[in-house]
Every structure is written in C-alpha cells, then in structure tokens.
Regions:
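Acidic, serine/threonine/proline-rich low-complexity intrinsically disordered regions
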Residues: 112-115, 161-167
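GST-like domain detector, emphasizing the conserved glutathione-binding G-site
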Residues: 1-129, 134
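Acidic/histidine-enriched, glycine/proline-rich intrinsically disordered or flexible terminal extensions
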Residues: 192-206
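Catalytic cores of nucleotide-enabled group-transfer and carboxylate-activating enzymes in metabolic
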Residues: 126-131, 150-158, 180
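Surface-exposed helix-capping loop/turn segments at secondary-structure junctions
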Residues: 130-140, 184-188
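Generic structural signal for secondary-structure transition and capping sites
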Residues: 96, 133, 161, 181-185
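GST superfamily/GST-like fold recognition
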Residues: 137-162
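Extended, well-ordered alpha-helical scaffold segments
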Residues: 116-120, 124, 167-181
Length: 206
C-alpha cells in the first residue's frame, strides 16, 4: 500500500479545521491522528517540537507545520489566483489577535476591554460583509479564501451567539451558515477518538 501523508489534528482548532477543509477540497486522503493538546503524543513532538497542530508529515519525510503550508500543498495552483494573501494577513494577524483577546481576555496581559476587541473584529466583519455581495470572498464561488477565513468567523460567532445574531452583517451570516451547513464542512468536523502512538490507522476523510 502506498504511504499516505499523516495529519496531526485537533477537531476544534480553527487552523486544523482549515487544513482539513483544504484536504477535502483537493480530494486528498491522509492518515489522521487526533490530538488532545494536554496529552500530546510523543511522535508529534518528535516531528514538530513546538507541539501545535496541524502538522502534516509527507511520505518523503517533509514536515509541514503551518496550516497555510498544508493548504498550499493541497491546492497550490488555486492559491496563485486572486488577492487571498491580503485576507490571510488580515485574518491571521489583526482579526485573530483581537478574537483571542475577546474570547480569552484573562490570558493576555496586553488585552484591552472585551468590548474593544470584539468591536475590532466587527470592523473587519463589516468589511467582509461588503466583500460578500457576490456570495463568496472572491466572487460567486467557493475558493481557498473562504476556507481560510470561515473557521475563525465561526469561532467569533460562537463566542457570544446572541450578540453576533444582533449585528447587521447579513452577508457574513449567510456566507458562514451556508458553508457550515455544507457537506464539505460537516465532513471536516467528523469526530475521531484521541490517537495514541500504538493505535491502528485512521483515515481522513472516513
């Protein structure tokens, strides 16, 4: 049997979610190792001492330790099209920084008020709302840009769902809900038991 790439993943991590979405989008199959972050398997730390997920170990021994590198490996040619890089920078820097301080204010010494960071995220979502007039982030069809962003918008929405639903960002809500209800996203969130170093193989997608 041909060796498959190995993906170390954590189901709820937005970075791991977007890596799994890219794998599904590209019809890739991997061996999946579901990680509990407080109980990381030794093999993960041997491949990637920083111990974060996702990590993709390729059959040739190459190790991809960042979600964007995994997405590039999955769908490289699509990632040469459009201005998705600007969206990545906005999401992974400004939006994620404020999202973390909104969701986990006690973890950050430099955090301002919860409302401050929530409103900073909302400013970005308002810009997304205008961009989504065409249905998706880069026009009228699902692209890599949507897969990059939706796990983080979902995390923001779920932090205080009642508040989120009161905001005037109808395009964002429609876009997010449409993706979350899609077979692609539902498949990306399939539950796996925690993987141990001596467990049998588990494959993604199932």
């Amino acid at each position: 049997m041909v060796s498959l790439p190995i993906l170390y993943s954590f189901r709820r991590c937005p970075y791991a979610i977007r890596a799994r979405l890219a794998l599904l989008h590209s019809n890739s199959i991997v061996e999946l190792r579901e990680v509990v972050l407080r109980d990381r398997p030794l093999s993960l730390l041997e491949y990637s001492p920083k111990g974060t997920v996702p990590v993709l170990v390729l059959p040739n021994g190459e190790i991809l330790e960042e979600s964007m590198d995994i997405m590039l490996w999955c769908i490289g040619e699509e990632m040469l099209i459009g201005d998705w890089q600007e969206l990545v920078e906005l999401n992974d820097n400004e939006f994620k920084v404020n999202l973390d301080r909104y969701k986990y204010p006690d973890r950050f010494d430099d955090a301002a008020s919860m409302e401050f960071h929530r409103n900073k995220c909302l400013e970005i979502l308002n810009s997304f709302n205008q961009r989504l007039d065409g249905g998706f982030m880069m026009g009228n069809g699902l692209t890599i840009a949507d897969l990059i962003l939706v796990p983080f918008v979902r995390q923001f929405a779920n932090t205080d769902r009642d508040w989120f639903e009161q905001q005037d960002i109808p395009n964002v809500k429609r876009w997010m809900n449409g993706i979350l209800q899609s077979e692609l996203f539902i498949s990306s969130m399939t539950k796996y038991k925690q993987w141990q170093d001596d467990d049998d193989l588990a494959y993604f997608p199932k």
